[in-house]
Amino acid sequence: MEMICVLFLSLVPAYSRGQGVYAPAQAQIIHAGQACVVKEDNISERVYTIREGDTLVLQCLVTGHPRPQVRWTKTAGSASDKFQETSVLNETLRIEKIQRLQGGRYYCKAENGVGVPAIRSIRVDVQYLDEPVLTVHQTISDVRGSFYQEKTVFLRCTVNSNPPARFIWKRGAETLSHSQDNGVDIYEPLYTQGETKVLKLKNLRPQDYASYTCQVSVRNVCSIPDKSITFQLTNTTAPPALKLSVNETLVVNPGDNVTMQCSLTGGDPQPEVLWSHSPGPLPPNSLVQGGNLTIWRIRVEDSGYYNCTAINNVGNPAKKTVNLLVRSMKNATFQITPDVIKESETIQLGQDLKLSCHVDAVPQEKVVYSWYKNGKPARFSDRLLITRNDPELPPVTCSLEIIDLRFSDYGTYLCVATFQGAPIPDLSVEVNISSETVPPTISVPKGQSTITVREGSRAELQCEVRGKPKPPIIWSRVDKETPMPSGTMTVETYDGKLRLESVSRDMSGTYKCQTARYNGFNIRPREALVQLNVQFPPVVEPAFQDVRQGMGRSVTLRCTMLKGSPMKVATSVWRFNGTLLAQPPAEQQDYSELKVDSVSRETSGSYECSISNDVGVSACLFQVSAKAYSPEFYYDTPNPTLSQKQSKNYSYILQWTQKEPDAVDPILKYRLEVRQLAQRNTIQTFIPVQKMEKGLLLEHILPNLKVPQSYEVRLTPITSFGAGDMAARIIRYMEPINYPSPTDNTCRFEDEKICGFVQDKMDNFDWTRQNALTQNPKRTVNTGPPTDISGTPEGYYMFIEASRPRVTGDKARLISPLYNITAKYYCVSFYYHMYGKHIGSLNLLVRVRNKRAIDTQVWSLSGNRGNMWQQAHVPINPPGPFQIIFEGVRGTSYEGDIAIDDVTLKKGDCPRKPIGPNKAVALPGSGVSAQHGPCLCGPLTFFLYVLLR
């Protein structure tokens, strides 16, 4: 009777009782993966506790129609941990090897365009315990008029952890407690970063010289083991001390081989010596051997501070620093400064004049400047003064000042910078002083004040400088506080030209050129402005638009220019399926339009509008048709799987709505294509449509699907125009379990939810769901089933693996959902596979939930039972709500895999045929014997089922 009803429903499409199934998104976050929980009462939707290094798996379960899209975001993390928003179609967020900085609050945002988005959050708490750090500090104080000294030792133990760690101090094997005697004190210091506990040993006694251990624990949260560190305190314990073989400032020549020796002069236990460099790491041409640091063929860029540090966790680390300077000279510049007192900007006879010379050198203070006039050393006099370090100019700048300039002072002055006694080439700069030496002027050449170029081409901005000498030109942007294309804020040129390669629209704007105050006159800079205009092709919208309209109706297409340079439509060209359309000349405006008078099969297709602004062309693309939009599959169907008890087939309730049905002509029928995954054959049928409106839920039953196969379903609407857009989805088999009312339902483990069974968190390892296709090809031979009870490679079963790291006696427990009592007697039936010479035990337990949970073993089987599936029937009579537990126990070695399949919980008696190890066991508190007679539950259930139908 049931098969006839299912076949009848599969031929006629059904419709929902109401209209408008469009619903806003709803979301719920669940966590999977390697979660661990501190306490049972902390299990909630909003907190996910996980161990650092494990895999985080969050699932955002969504409902709503159309199917919502999911986006994950994160807050409350480190600034360095930027979590990017992504669209995850499978609603799953997975983070491998999660780190502590990735803890925080994660948000799932689901939206489908109906109502407001659904936003849910969950806090991820990453648990960790670092290795503790133990440091020792000693103080010595005079007591009673300096007759003797009192020595106090502080052992400081610090650790980073989450949750906060518990500290245990031990002296040898003895656990120390706070104030257990006058010589011991344990306290937590104020204003410490991380967690810290201090063990204070007052007025050190002989027995205090011992081995001390700091043990830290997070109480086995997430199975994180305790950690500890030990220190041996002796009467020779002392902090490290260092000495250097070189001065704290070391000046060397480029190309030298440099060795710096850092020697230990004290410390117990033996300190560790480390070398470091700032800024940056040690140079690649260096080698550290013990306390010696050697740098071969040293370069200028190897200059910096080299730090030698000795650490033994007693007292503060000892540190010595060497400031290593590699001699160098570069960038010789000069300045001509007219009479400052008279605020002059030109050279005039009778006024003062100052010539300045500067080089960038290391070390700067070791540079020696020499001045020459017309090739001869300048003679110093009352009118010719030399200042070695001019306070008005950059540090270590040498100035030659001429008082009361005369005609005889005209000539060529040469400034030479040297490192005396060092093999560094001299640098020199020449300054010519004459009546022709005049300050600079700057201007833009005629016709060059505005430069217009196309995007991607080369641009050249130019300013002309007149004067003697000609200073460099410094370019910068005026209208935007952005760097130049080179990445710097200014660019220096010597020919007055700023060359820009491959310009972009962002480079448009005003540029300033100004004279530098070096290699010329040290006066107020002269400035000029140049405007750069970058022309670029138009930006249009829409780039693509799907236009749907019923046959015979008109539609107007518009392509709008959003921006461009120049901002005007020069020409617009329309094409239909690549063929040029005649279009009247458009007026000067920022858009172009085309009207399609009547949509038909002949006028349906691709329309392209190309808009030009004489610089480039951009196009709008319109796809015009009377095709129907795609169906919208309904994913929130309750219990979509219908099982067929007489065969291992199932039916599936497929539901959908039609997107925008009124946008085009009425839908006449649907083409349905069903294909089993991994196969090519497709079954095609047509579903007629009797009624259609927006939001109406359509329904069709897919019959004779094979358990546990998955199928691809394609659904295409058909109108008088023809086939519309196709929608596809995957149909996956789900166990039709309506627990907690399990009567006559069989769990075949074909669905990932495994019928609500869960792994016990208190066992040693887990059961695994697998089939012949997913099992490990390297699995141990001579044990375990090749397939499930059905014999198909796709069929799933639950399995325990006995190979390493499992050891003898390890247990894996699989716990069912909680079942409410609706009958006096139940029968648990299941298939088991126990093949291998090292088989352990398979136990069935019943957990009764009354005032407290009580686990009772009701069935057990051990040893090799052959390479076959066998069935067991176990009667139970629980006195209250109960769960069943399958417990697999690992045997003596690796050939001991155990599997179970097809678990059924039925009301009433078990079959009366004898079952080897089966034995009825009365549960505590039941008050009845294990043997019982038949009951009328089966017929009564069938009668109620018929009434409900």
UniProtKB/Swiss-Prot annotation:
Disulfide partners: C60-C108, C157-C214, C262-C308, C357-C415, C463-C513, C559-C609
GO annotation, biological process: neuron migration
Tissue expression summary: In the embryonic brachial spinal cord, selectively expressed by medial lateral motor column neurons, some populations of dorsal root ganglion neurons, and interneurons.
Role noted for this protein: Required for radial migration of cortical neurons in the superficial layer of the neocortex.
Domain of life: Eukaryota
Alphabetically ordered keywords of this record: Cell membrane, Developmental protein, Differentiation, Disulfide bond, Glycoprotein, GPI-anchor, Immunoglobulin domain, Lipoprotein, Membrane, Neurogenesis, Repeat, Signal
GO cellular component: plasma membrane; side of membrane
Subunit structure, interactors included: Interacts heterophilically through its MAM domain with proteins in axon-rich regions and through its Ig-like domains with proteins in differentiating muscle.
Species of the source: Gallus gallus (Chicken)
Encoding gene per record: MDGA1
Cited SUPFAM superfamilies: Concanavalin A-like lectins/glucanases, Fibronectin type III, Immunoglobulin
Signal peptide start and end residues: 1-18
Residues where lipid is bound covalently (GPI-anchor amidated serine): S926
Location within or outside the cell: Cell membrane
Domain MAM, chain residue ranges per copy: 745-912
Domain Fibronectin type-III: 637-737
Residue positions assigned to the propeptide: 927-949
Name of the featured protein: MAM domain-containing glycosylphosphatidylinositol anchor protein 1
Glycan attachment points: N42, N90, N235, N247, N257, N292, N307, N331, N432, N577, N649, N820
Membrane topology: Lipid-anchor; GPI-anchor
Ig-like domain segment(s): 24-125, 132-230, 240-323, 338-432, 440-531, 537-625
